[in-house]
Each structure stands twice: as structure tokens, then as C-alpha cells.
Amino acid sequence: MPFSADSVTSLRQIADALAARSVSAEELAREYLARIEAGRALNAFVAVDPELTLAQARAADERRAQGQATPLTGVPIAHKDVFVTRGWKSTAGSKMLANYESPFDATVVERLAAAGMVTLGKTNMDEFAMGSSNENSFFGPVSNPWDTSRVPGGSSGGSAAAVAAGLAPAATGTDTGGSIRQPASFSGITGIKPTYGRVSRYGMIAFASSLDQGGPMAHSAEDCALLLNGMAGFDPKDSTSLTPELGGVTEDFTRLLGQPRAGATASQPLAGLRIGLPREYFGKGLSADVEQALRAALAEYEKLGATLVDVTLPKTELSIPVYYIIAPAEASSNLSRFDGVRYGHRAAQYGDLLDMYKKSRAEGFGPEVKRRIMVGTYVLSHGYYDAYYLQAQKIRRIIADDFQRAFTQCDVIMGPVAPTVAWKLGEKTADPVQMYLADIFTLSTSLAGLPGMSVPCGFGEGNMPVGLQLIGNYFDEAQLLQTAHAFQQATDWHLRRPA
């Protein structure tokens, strides 16, 4: 029976088929390109170039023929359009960069290409990664494959929708305040945001430099581990990249997946694992359907040998105001470079130089980006810097300290990714505050720089996916992936696909 993308359940399955010559990288690429074309209504991709993709696939086949293949050689992947890519336009979902072509590849793209992965195209996203629904893109909103009248989550919504719909077996994403975890939850896939600095930011178009972090999005923890092997590691071109002395050593995350815990048994592989449940994550605001799915998943973890422990993260409610001071402040600085002079959109008609700046930025940026630039400029202005920005940084430190206290009582923290399942397209666009509140459970992890992931754990209202959030201590990606993998070995939520 010939290999087909219809039967794909994991990247390992693809890698094994390629190694066994059951399918060639070129044949696989052609099949996924056909799926992308058939799934255009989702609007998950903003750039596809079959010639470039097939050239990479042929190179992967040649590499395998020469005996130089890695576990990822020939495996297709889609890249979020926030990573610059030579040969494809790199737009960050914005009119400002609608025609920008980068002369180089982002380190993440470069490393995965070096492993032999084949780029299928660039995925849609909220403009400059600012959004929770993928409705802020210059190229239009993305639809959720489980219900096309709903959002896929954001800002990595195109990547999430592409993986969920089978248009790509894996994708890259970025997470500033939840932009890998929330769309993974809404779209029923697995995604991990590594410790800040684990994955290079070089070539990632910046939103908030002290928060942005790249990571993989795929169907399973095993897939994410395989991808993280290729993505993680120190990069001298990124000043925020972790050096080996600070934890930037590349681990073999796939090998660690199956490493038995001390005292574990076949029926209880997680014996001795302490799971912290923050009381602030299970109170007012969490919808009943989401909580029901989470409680069932936690009961499964108990069957696997884990112990549930109550912990507290008292400053959780402050994470929204803190984030929406720090992130816009950094965005206003990062986006000041887009002035219509060096690169980016330039207004066709203008008077003097100042008028050109104003018109180019007014035309090039969308409403949400303008809103955040204005907020950021305000909190950094004279008379408000001390009152807002510095105070927010102090509370950020307290939020990080809260996590460290919690980790003295537990090994992994679990809770919801979002208060609800995916909402309807257009439902929250008129009320930015309601949109911001959807990130209440993911922001604090980002502010602390901790690793976090979303794992499918059931379904809620409208038969929409629900994700369980796993949060680890610094550099604890291996334990997070191992914990998620054990759950996925015992359940099949990650194998469910939209009709």
C-alpha cells in the first residue's frame, strides 16, 4: 500500500517511510502542495512556491541517496511568516512588509534546512504577531479547521490551522504571550514555547524582544521533541541566545522522552511526578466545559502515577496589565524602524520627509499594531516611564518569583491554556480588552521566561478542542515533553482530526 499523507500520525512515521523508500521527499512534497491548494479556503498560507519546495525536496532525496540523511531529512514543514526566509517574501502579516524579501534565512529556518527539512511555504499570522485570533492579518483572517466559522487562535494561527488540517505535518511558531500555546489549544494540536533564549531569535521579525521565543507546532510531544532537537541551541548571532554555561546546550529531547523516571512502572510511568495546580487558574472566568476536560486529563495523570498538589500564583491577575505595558513598549521601539525609508511600505504621495513618515506608517500598519505602538510610546514617555514601565518590570520579577516558590512544591504546573474554546470570527474584534483577557493563563509564563506547552486533552462547547497547559521550570523542556508524551501514550486526543 503506497504511503499517503492521509495516514500520517507523526513525523516519525514520515521519517520511517522516507528511510524505507516507501515515498520520496519529492512525492511527499507534491502531495502536501496539493493539500495546501485544496485547503486554500482556510487562508492558512500567505506564500507558497512549488518550484522552491520541490527543489528542496529533490536535494533531500539526493542527500538520502548519498547516505547523509538525518531523522528530519525530507520531512515537510511550514514556517510562520515572522521568520525571514530567502526566496520567499517575509511579511509578518503586515502591509508594511508585503513586498519584503530577505537576503538571508532566520537561524531557525537555516537549522531545520540544514537537517534536510523541506519548506512548504509561509503561514498566515496576526500582524507582527500582535493578536490572539489571527484576525489582524493584512492577508485576511484564518479559519479554524474544526469549525470554519471560528478563529484558530493567534498569533501563530496559520501554522496551527495548517497542521490541524493536514496541510503540513509540522510548523514553526512564535510565542510572545501565548502565540504557540493558545492556537495549539484552539486547533487541537501540540505546541511548545521553550525557555526564553533556548531557540535563536535571529531572523525572527521582532515584536517584544524580551518575550519573543520560537518553537515547534505539530501533532504530538514526540514530534515537537524531534523538531526542538533541530531548532534549539546557542546562536552567536542572537545576543539573547543562551550560552552553554547558561543552559544553551542542545539536548536530545527525543532520547529523553522514553527515559524512565526513578520508581516508575509500566502502568505508572509518571510515579513520583508532582503536578502543581494553581488555584488562580481554576476559579472565576474558566468556562465549565474547559474545566471538565482539564479535570478528566488530570485524573488520567493520576492514573499514570502523578500526584496533584495545590499551589498558588498570587500575581496571575496582574499579568495582563504588566504584559500590556511591557510588550507594547518594546513593540513601539522595535517597529520604529519601519519608516518607509530603508525598507517597508512607502506612501505613494506625500509632502516633506515628516509627511512621508506619517503616511507610510499610517498606511502600512493595521489598527491593532497602531494601538499597541501608541500605548507603548505613552508608557515610555517622560513622566510615565517610572509610573508604568518600571513598575511593570518590578511586578514581572515578582511573577517570576511566584513560579519559583511554586516549583519548590511541584515538578510541573498544569492548568488551562485559555478560559474558553475558540470563539466565532468577529466575535471579539470590536473589544480589544476581551481579546486580551483570553491570554490570562499564558502571559505569566512568558513574562517569567519559562517553558510552556499545550497538549490536546478533550473537547468543549461546539465540539471544539481544549488544550491542557504544562509549565516547567527553566530548561525543563525535556521533562515537559516526557510528561506530555506519557499522557499521549495513554490517550488519543492528539490523534483526533477535524472532519
From Swiss-Prot:
Its GO CC terms are: glutamyl-tRNA(Gln) amidotransferase complex
Under the heading Gene3D superfamilies, the entry gives: Amidase signature (AS) domain (3.90.1300.10)
Q: Which UniProt keywords apply?
A: ATP-binding, Ligase, Nucleotide-binding, Protein biosynthesis
Q: Which domain of life is it from?
A: Bacteria
Q: Could you tell me what reaction this enzyme catalyses?
A: L-glutamyl-tRNA(Gln) + L-glutamine + ATP + H2O = L-glutaminyl-tRNA(Gln) + L-glutamate + ADP + phosphate + H(+)
- The top EC class is ligase
Can you tell me where the transmembrane regions are?
none
Active site (record annotation): K80 (charge relay system), S155 (charge relay system), S179 (acyl-ester intermediate)
GO terms for biological process, alphabetical: translation
- EC number(s) for this protein? 6.3.5.7
Q: Which GO terms describe its molecular function?
A: ATP binding; glutaminyl-tRNA synthase (glutamine-hydrolyzing) activity
Q: Please describe the quaternary structure of this protein.
A: Heterotrimer of A, B and C subunits.
The family note in this entry says: Belongs to the amidase family. GatA subfamily.
Q: What does this protein do?
A: Allows the formation of correctly charged Gln-tRNA(Gln) through the transamidation of misacylated Glu-tRNA(Gln) in organisms which lack glutaminyl-tRNA synthetase. The reaction takes place in the presence of glutamine and ATP through an activated gamma-phospho-Glu-tRNA(Gln).
Name of the protein: Glutamyl-tRNA(Gln) amidotransferase subunit A
Gene encoding this chain? Answer: gatA
